[in-house]
């Protein structure tokens, strides 16, 4: 049996209606590499500059976590006192019935327990597909989905599973470990020294090992990290 190897992406591509940001995981937290406005006169060219900067920072390979904008996510808090994980899952699915324009079968949702309550974050599958298609088109090598909600909306980091592209981007046996702490920008990344060269970005092989990947300093409650409910 192939041994499972946990990994965390070395970049985050944050998508919003205001623009696109690329963050780099460092020992000091998430550093902003750059951002591009959606109304840019040449969006593709500016995104290419971001991508080339990323490959200069991590010559071994670029793999990214896609942050879905909050406007595309439905957050709920439900009473789950005394429930086990299976019962919380069922309660979340019931609460989502009619809460979005989509049938529950067309949603991906994550549930985090917080005392007598559970926090639910749900997103449409088609939203994830569109986000992945965009990231793949611009060669940001997306491997998983998450969100960065306001603290009052969700406890922890919503995780929406791995991308379709992940199987081709990850090494055999690698699995993406969900983020345990909120994804926040701790600083601005200095530009790499020297010219930025467009390296071969088709076969990323390097990632940031889980054991040596401090994330943002913002603490969160010690809640179990649940796998997303793919229903």
Residue spans for each PLM region:
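Hydrophobic/aromatic-enriched cytosolic interaction surfaces used to assemble or bind macromolecules
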Residues: 1-231
